[in-house]
Amino acid sequence: MTTICAVKHNGKTAIAGDGQVTLGEKVIMKGSARKVRRIYNDKVAVGFAGGVADAINLEEKFENKLNEYSGNLERAAVELAQEWRGDRTLQKLEAMLIVIDKDNLLIVSGSGEVIVPDNGVLAIGSGGNYAQAAAVALSEYSKDMSAGEIAKAALNIAADIDIFTNHNIIVEELA
């Protein structure tokens, strides 16, 4: 399991993810997986939570949609969600994505939804609720922090609480 958190703050966006891969609920298989990546000529970043194979499959499909729609993040996300809803094989995938560009944060969920946040913060995964609460508070009360600093701090807070999230955090910030 893992935690991914994305933040839009002071005109920048950032996404952070930890590196823990868990087998079932008892064994940590790996602590340094990279679940946050830049794609589309480094103009978009994506983070995933859920089954690793499922998430990688969805990430590849999203990247194909992004190329098909010339980097239009919202259109690519909506098209992936429509495909996800309509394909019985995809419906069985257990993963979620957060995708960001310099202006937008979106969740693409397993039920085929595209979610835009009201408050500039999104989080998914086992520690998502903790990370989201921390990022909302930091965004509200720490105006001098960057989006990347907020996302990383939120992940560290989640890792202190959630046993399925670790402190091996990767941050990608887009300007």
From Swiss-Prot:
Q: So what EC number does this one have?
A: 3.4.25.2
Q: Name one Pfam family in it.
A: Proteasome
InterPro entries the record matches: ATP-dep_Prtase_HsIV_su, Ntn_hydrolases_N, Proteasome_sua/b, Proteasome_suB-type
Q: Where are the transmembrane segments?
A: none
Q: Where does Na(+) bind?
A: A159, D162, T165
Q: What GO molecular functions are on record for this protein? A: metal ion binding; threonine-type endopeptidase activity
Name of the protein in question: ATP-dependent protease subunit HslV
Q: Report the sequence similarity comment from the record.
A: Belongs to the peptidase T1B family. HslV subfamily.
Q: What is the native source organism of this protein?
A: Ligilactobacillus salivarius (strain UCC118) (Lactobacillus salivarius)
Gene that encodes the chain: hslV
Q: Which UniProt keywords apply?
A: Allosteric enzyme, Cytoplasm, Hydrolase, Metal-binding, Protease, Sodium, Threonine protease
Q: Which GO terms describe its cellular component?
A: HslUV protease complex; proteasome core complex
Compartment list: Cytoplasm
Q: Which reaction does it catalyse?
A: ATP-dependent cleavage of peptide bonds with broad specificity
Active site per database record: T2
Its annotated function is as follows: Protease subunit of a proteasome-like degradation complex believed to be a general protein degrading machinery.
Q: Which GO terms describe its biological process?
A: proteolysis involved in protein catabolic process
Enzyme category, top tier: hydrolase
Activity regulation as described:
Allosterically activated by HslU binding.
- Please give the subunit comment from the record: A double ring-shaped homohexamer of HslV is capped on each side by a ring-shaped HslU homohexamer. The assembly of the HslU/HslV complex is dependent on binding of ATP.
